[in-house]
Amino acid sequence: MEAPLVSLDEEFEDIRPSCTEEPEEKPQCLYGTSPHHLEDPSLSELENFSSEIISFKSMEDLVNEFDEKLNVCFRNYNAKTESLAPVKNQLQIQEEEETLRDEEVWDALTDNYIPSLSEDWRDPNIEALNGNSSDIEIHEKEEEEFNEKSENDSGINEEPLLTADQVIEEIEEMMQNSPDPEEEEEVLEEEDGGEISSQADSVLLQEMQALTQTFNNNWSYEGLRHMSGSELTELLDRVEGAIRDFSEELVHQLARRDELEFEKEVKNSFITVLIEVQNKQREQRELMKKRRKEKGLSLQSNRIEKGSQMPLKRFSMEGISNILQSGIRQTFGSSGADRQYLNTVIPYEKKSSPPSVEDLQMLTNILFAMKEDNEKVPTLLTDYILKVLCPT
């Protein structure tokens, strides 16, 4: 099969008139090659390629000529190619490197790509790990963002359950950070009392320091021996007075510690009973939902059965008794496993000051009675309303 012929006359119509030949001079081309000739004789054959292109050639001839051109170009590896692609001098390269070293932008860009000395770059696995590290980090960040969005949308992002001590500490911090404008005078009085107590403590500390100095200086056999009787009696009076003062302060601090411990126990018991009541209320709600579903299914089945059977009587004694029993249960409370006082609502008035220990004790008793479904709930609730919410 003959190879197809290729005509290049149409492509080079604009090139032919550009060359003007003179009888005595060499041809001059306006669009041709560069005016200077290649110095290397091995590369001089490239100048004749432009003249050979303008002819009828087949595809096979073009391929062969292309191979010849490649052979001519890569035949002599020692040929000088500075005229084709000039190479920079070593001095120019050093100057460019020095200027790049002084550039802050270049340093900031290249510092992130410095290889670590601990890694062996000859290991083929290192390149794969380093290449995929950024992709893995990006994928992890995208997963975290997606999980956060899904949690926020679905309401899963709930706060963790806190212990009773943590809840009490948070309540105390909230109460401390919310001052009461109505009790500013009491706060000022307490501050004055605190200042007085701090002053008394400072006085006691000063007396104690003075006594320790005298003890260190004089409480030796020789020091006491050289002291007079009046000095000894004065020192004895000072020691006895300091002992009395320190004993009173110790008793006061111990009483304060007992009060704080009792208050902490009351708060812990209040939080514990409150959590137990909330859990039981949640269980009761779930149980009521299940009962409603079962009741709805039973009603549907009864309707289907009644529809299939013809009613003989419009009213019966059994139906009337069932209606009366259901009405009594709804009026006076349900019997059995249903709790009557568990869902009792306790009225509470939010104040700027924290509830006192007595108030917490009353609330704890009400919650404990609600948990046990005790009949004392109405009585305790009435006492709480009369003594705390509406005192006479």
Swiss-Prot record:
| GO cellular component term of the entry, any | microtubule
Q: Which GO terms describe its biological process?
A: cellular response to growth factor stimulus; establishment of cell polarity; establishment of mitochondrion localization; hippocampus development; mitochondrion organization; negative regulation of autophagosome assembly; positive regulation of anterograde axonal transport of mitochondrion; positive regulation of neuron projection development
Spans annotated as Disordered:
1-36, 175-196
- InterPro entries xref list: FEZ (IPR011680)
One example GO MF annotation: protein kinase C binding
Q: Which residues carry this modification: Phosphoserine?
A: S58, S298, S316
Primary location recorded for the protein, binned into one broad class: cytoplasm
Q: Which UniProt keywords apply?
A: Cell membrane, Coiled coil, Cytoplasm, Cytoskeleton, Membrane, Microtubule, Phosphoprotein, Transport, Ubl conjugation
| Disulphide-bonded residues | none
Pfam families cross-referenced by the UniProt entry: FEZ
Localization per record: Cytoplasm, Cytoskeleton, Microtubule organizing center, Centrosome; Cell membrane
Compositional bias of kind Acidic residues? 180-194
* PTM field: Phosphorylated by protein kinase C zeta; which enhances interaction with UBE4B and polyubiquitination. Polyubiquitinated in a UBE4B-dependent manner; which does not lead to proteasomal degradation and may be important for neurogenic activity. Polyubiquitin linkage seems to be mainly through Lys-26.
List where this protein forms a coiled coil. Answer: 230-298
Subunit-structure text:
Homodimer. Interacts with the NH2-terminal variable region (V1) of PKC zeta and weakly with that of PKC epsilon. Interacts with UBE4B and SAP30L. Interacts with SCOC and ULK1; SCOC interferes with ULK1-binding to FEZ1. Directly interacts with SCOC and UVRAG. Stabilizes the interaction between SCOC and UVRAG during amino acid starvation.
* Chain's role: May be involved in axonal outgrowth as component of the network of molecules that regulate cellular morphology and axon guidance machinery. May participate in the transport of mitochondria and other cargos along microtubules.
Name the family the entry cites: Belongs to the zygin family.
Instruction: Tell me what this protein is called.
Output: Fasciculation and elongation protein zeta-1
Q: Which organism is it from?
A: Mus musculus (Mouse)
